[in-house]
Amino acid sequence: MRGISGFGLTSLALSAGLANAIDLDVNNRDSVLKASKIVVDNILSVYNNYTESPGGIPGLLPQPYYWYNAGNMFNSLIKYWALSGDQSIVPTLQSALVFQLGPDFNYMPPNQSKSLGNDDQAAWALAAMRAAEYDLPVPNDLLSNNITWASIADTVFKEQVARWDTESCGG
């Protein structure tokens, strides 16, 4: 599975204007949180500038980033939220995770059908699993349909297992 590389994440942060060094003391929790907030704010600046522009779609990043990159980014942002307690990003996380679900709540949205593969879908399912692990609040419109982050991840897993084909491609 492809992942967002350190280079890709660094490029995304730099494209938001983060070109100066960040003052960081890795032995000081407050310093780590402050440095993390700077990086997160810059990443979200790129994301928000794209999604709030005409034609922007919640959960997607601008070119050259792919759909799975956004899924991996949100997975990381969920962990940041859980470790930092930064509640300001919860609506952004929820919006992205829900908008990219697709009509069957399985991270197969019609707007990604041209290039969607198991690895891409799994990137988003892993973000949903992390959301479940860290108790990211589930939006009421999902809860009212008995849908949780864990049930979404489970749905994707079951769909991918059902697609497993050892006959034509060795699995």
Regions found by a protein language model. Name each.
Residues 1-25:
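Fungal secretory targeting signals
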Residues 4, 137-144:
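Short, flexible/disordered intra-domain loops and linkers
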Residues 20-111, 144-170:
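Low-complexity, Ser/Thr/Pro/Gly-enriched N-terminal "stalk/linker" regions
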Residues 22, 128-131, 135:
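Short, helix-capping/interhelical loops that line the mouth of catalytic, cofactor-
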Residues 77-80, 127-131:
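The core hydrophobic/aromatic register in alpha-helical repeat solenoids, strongest
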Residues 81, 85, 132-139:
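Short coil/turn linking the two alpha-helices of tandem helical-hairpin repeats
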Residues 115-128, 152:
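Mobile, glycine-rich extracellular loop/lid and propeptide segments
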